[in-house]
């Protein structure tokens, strides 16, 4: 019996053990690492504020300031999980692990249609890609966004395959509902893969009628799910319309003000590295497939016309990628929705490989990812809010009601560990940002025991501010790179 034939039996049972293995793969070690600032701490803090206030419509970072830079779906997911399973890092990250696991299953479902000879292979590739696996263990909007974009792509692929049967309409409606939820997860970026799929649908309009992808019930679900929250909060606060359209959409697209790799080579530096490292251990097959295509540019128009699968994957990947490259705000996780079609491309690229060779590469990738997870859990990084919370809890105060960061970025994840309010104060009397109230006016307010944290560069200015503003203060120690002060009264004595 050949080695490859010996390996076929486990492959035939792939779908039987996929779900338990996938759940173990996605959920294991989720709680071993503390929350990292800024993203994880902020998302969890806003979710906790929803649970505390009961206001699930308007996100807040504390009881004073709203935080509407992102739509609320991620906050809702984290808040629901923490409410159900308790205040633990595992519970906070559970929605993302679940979204990752479901994305793997959806990629596998598309594999049945697009890689029928080995439908399990795209799921295996996606599960062992570096970027989706790493992102599933970091609380941001991107893993949920990738799940919903993959969901609507899978629904439209299935509808196309069933276009001659009655079941296609249900998949189309489900696809539009998923597109609405993608928009509720992150706004306009959630529709970029949809634009690529729309280009593909237009390209085959003579073969598959464009009405296949239209559904009145689906479009209604898309509008209600995708735009309902935006319309509701804008009705109460009309100036949010300009904020959403100008600050959060147009300025991020066209302006370098977000300081996220907006320079000329930022796209190459960020996205080039993300695609090369994020697709490990399948990078080489993808590069070889790309090289083979580029060596014969004259054959590309023929392939575009003759191969619907290649056309679908090209539209799905290239249309969003062009927008991401042109936009002036660039981060690695932005490309996460493109890794589902990349998994399908990689599965085709290794189509001639033996099952044993595929399994060995996937196993090597899995071992590398587990090692990366273990490293992240064992090494305490400066942005670890759990470590900082332990240092603050050891300070000589009877209780902690609020932690205020003076002239430095707040660590909102402390709210998760200390059950205290977290805010940012400014030493300027007229600070530029609404979420930075002046320390001179805030510190005298008796809001329980407030610990003031300041870095060395601003410590002297804070002491001067306190001396003239409240007359007295007390240094109570250090926590990480911060020096801690309190003022008399408020329960800190």
Enumerate the predicted regions with their spans.
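Extracytoplasmic/secreted cell-surface and envelope-processing proteins
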Residues: 192, 461-463
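Transmembrane alpha-helical segments
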Residues: 349, 357-380
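Extracellular secreted precursors and ectodomains with disulfide-bonded cysteine-rich loops/domains
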Residues: 490-492
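Membrane-integral, polyisoprenol-dependent glycosyltransferases
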Residues: 2-351, 355-356, 375, 415, ...
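Short periplasmic/luminal acceptor-recognition loop of GT-C membrane glycosyltransferases, typified by
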Residues: 372-461, 475-481, 485-487
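Short secondary-structure junctions
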Residues: 465-477
């Amino acid at each position: 019996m050949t080695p490859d034939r010996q390996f076929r039996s486990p492959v035939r049972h792939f779908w039987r053990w996929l779900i338990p293995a996938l759940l173990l793969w996605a959920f294991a070690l989720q709680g071993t690492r503390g929350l990292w600032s800024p993203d994880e701490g902020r998302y969890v803090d806003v979710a906790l504020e929803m649970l505390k206030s009961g206001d699930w419509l308007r996100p807040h970072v504390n009881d004073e300031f709203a935080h509407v830079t992102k739509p609320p779906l991620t906050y809702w997911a984290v808040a629901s999980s923490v409410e159900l399973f308790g205040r633990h890092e595992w519970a906070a990250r559970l929605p993302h692990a679940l979204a990752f696991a479901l994305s793997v299953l959806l990629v596998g479902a598309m594999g049945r249609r697009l890689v029928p000879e080995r439908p399990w292979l795209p799921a295996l590739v996606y599960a062992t890609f570096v970027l989706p696996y790493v992102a599933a263990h970091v609380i941001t909007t991107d893993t949920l966004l990738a799940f919903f974009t993959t969901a609507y792509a899978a629904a439209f692929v299935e509808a196309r395959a069933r276009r001659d049967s009655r079941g296609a309409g249900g998949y189309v409606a489900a696809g539009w509902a998923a597109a609405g939820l993608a928009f509720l997860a992150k706004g306009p970026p959630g529709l970029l893969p949809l634009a690529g799929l729309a280009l593909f649908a237009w390209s085959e309009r003579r073969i598959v009628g464009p009405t296949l992808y239209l559904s009145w019930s689906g479009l209604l679900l898309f509008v209600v799910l995708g735009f309902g929250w935006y319309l509701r909060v804008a009705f109460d606060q009309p100036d949010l319309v300009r904020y959403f359209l100008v600050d959060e959409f147009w300025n991020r697209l066209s302006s370098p003000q977000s300081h996220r790799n907006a320079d000329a080579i930022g796209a190459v530096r960020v996205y080039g590295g993300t695609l090369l490292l994020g697709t490990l251990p399948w990078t080489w097959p993808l590069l070889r497939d790309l090289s083979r295509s580029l060596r014969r540019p004259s054959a590309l128009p023929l392939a575009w016309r003759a191969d619907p699968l290649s056309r679908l994957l090209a539209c799905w990947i290239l249309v969003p990628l062009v927008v991401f490259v042109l936009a002036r705000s660039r981060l690695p996780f932005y490309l996460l929705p493109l890794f589902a079609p990349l998994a399908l491309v990689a599965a085709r690229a290794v189509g001639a490989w033996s099952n044993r060779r595929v399994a060995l590469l996937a196993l090597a990738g899995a071992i590398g990812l587990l090692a990366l997870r273990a490293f992240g859990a064992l090494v305490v990084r400066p942005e670890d809010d759990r470590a900082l919370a332990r240092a603050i809890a050891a300070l000589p105060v009877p209780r902690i009601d609020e932690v205020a960061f003076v002239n430095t970025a707040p660590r909102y994840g402390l709210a998760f560990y200390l059950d205290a309010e977290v805010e940012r104060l400014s030493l300027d009397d007229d600070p530029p940002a609404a979420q930075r109230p002046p320390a001179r006016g805030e510190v005298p307010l008796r809001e329980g025991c407030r610990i003031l944290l300041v870095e060395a560069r601003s410590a002297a200015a804070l002491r001067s501010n306190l001396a003239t503003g409240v007359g007295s203060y007390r240094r109570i120690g250090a926590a990480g790179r911060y020096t801690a002060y309190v003022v008399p009264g408020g329960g800190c004595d």
